[in-house]
Amino acid sequence: MNLSRFASRLRMAEEISKTKVGSSSTASVADSSAAASAATNAAKSRWKILWPNSLRWIPTSTDYIIAAEKRLLSILKTPYVQEQVSIGSGPPGSKIRWFRSTSNESRYINTVTFDAKEGAPTLVMVHGYGASQGFFFRNFDALASRFRVIAIDQLGWGGSSRPDFTCRSTEETEAWFIDSFEEWRKAQNLSNFILLGHSFGGYVAAKYALKHPEHVQHLILVGSAGFSAEADAKSEWLTKFRATWKGAVLNHLWESNFTPQKLVRGLGPWGPGLVNRYTTARFGAHSEGTGLTEEEAKLLTDYVYHTLAAKASGELCLKYIFSFGAFARKPLLQSASEWKVPTTFIYGMNDWMNYQGAVEARKSMKVPCEIIRVPQGGHFVFIDNPIGFHSAVLYACRKFISQDSSHDQQLLDGLRLV
């Protein structure tokens, strides 16, 4: 009996000892874990101190782009609706490249629509290469007073979806933009509208009007790209330049589809600084007209960075549409005689796009055509001189808008009809 009680007490002592050891071990592990966590946080804090904000990578995505867009458009007075309009996946068996994808990624076009008076004509605005619809921020309020303004980001740009770019020819690349725009039109149930395109957006707008003239009431091409081919131009200088080592390198980069956006992405944390230097110089110190305010410059820079740094998609069209030197592979000049839509060309006086291309096109066109040059404006005439630009647009559309304002029927002083 005594031996039994002794054995029982011995087992109890062993269990108590194990429990104490286990508790001590658990506490030790917990303490070690807490210490490790504290050390990690301290290391992160020291890293943040040692690694300045200027060297930290700034993330981007479609959500960041839309947020930057909303901040930029917050300075406007006219209410608007922003939506991502689904354009589907195309008809079964479609041979159009932009319909094809190995993923189930949705296709949508980022769209902003501004409030307008009942019965106002619809004006659809299409941005140029390397831009997005927010670039028209200085124009929306004024134009929305006379039009139902709708601005879009083309497929693969801005806040629109960015599918993998699989085009391998000029025809496929044109279809990427023209046919996706047509699917957007169907989704929006638009039958007739005035179509305005800037730069590369002008090229797309003109090609769309050639294919679907029944939907376009009037075509407005602002500093439009794509009128001249290398063979049409006095390109002796380009031939000589290509023969130099610099020309050979740049031509190789072009044919390799090296885009400005790739440079912004490749610079990582230095990318925003590069964009800031560009917007500050182009729309500030070196502005052709009215420079941006400090607030406008800050908001536009943030917006431009996010649109450029996002996934590469539509930007990869460059080498398929243009050859080195920005000469069109399928120039609009060659199809000018086929145009069925009345057209107005608008150029800044200092636009690097040569308005003589429009002059030559007009000689072959069988529809009404006007060419307007706006003073104090460069390639981004709608930012440089918004008042002059608005006058040119209203004059171009004088037959579609109400006649209650006589100044819409004439150009402001300084604007020139060519």
From Swiss-Prot:
Segments carrying motif HXXXXD motif: 379-384
Localization per Swiss-Prot or TrEMBL: Cytoplasm
Catalytic activity of the protein: a 1-acyl-sn-glycero-3-phosphate + an acyl-CoA = a 1,2-diacyl-sn-glycero-3-phosphate + CoA
Sample GO molecular function, one term: phospholipase A2 activity
Free-text comment on this protein's domains from its UniProt entry: The HXXXXD motif is essential for acyltransferase activity and may constitute the binding site for the phosphate moiety of the glycerol-3-phosphate.
PANTHER family to which the protein is assigned, alphabetical: PUMMELIG, ISOFORM A, RE40534P-RELATED
InterPro entries membership: AB_hydrolase_1, AB_hydrolase_fold
Gene Ontology BP annotations: cellular response to hypoxia; fatty acid homeostasis; lipid homeostasis; phospholipid biosynthetic process; phospholipid homeostasis; triglyceride homeostasis
Lineage: Eukaryota, Viridiplantae, Streptophyta, Embryophyta, Tracheophyta
Short sequence motif GXSXG: positions: 197-201
Gene3D superfamilies found in the cross-reference section: alpha/beta hydrolase
Top-level taxon in the UniProt lineage: Eukaryota
Protein name: 1-acylglycerol-3-phosphate O-acyltransferase
Keywords: Acyltransferase, Cytoplasm, Lipid biosynthesis, Lipid metabolism, Phospholipid biosynthesis, Phospholipid metabolism, Transferase
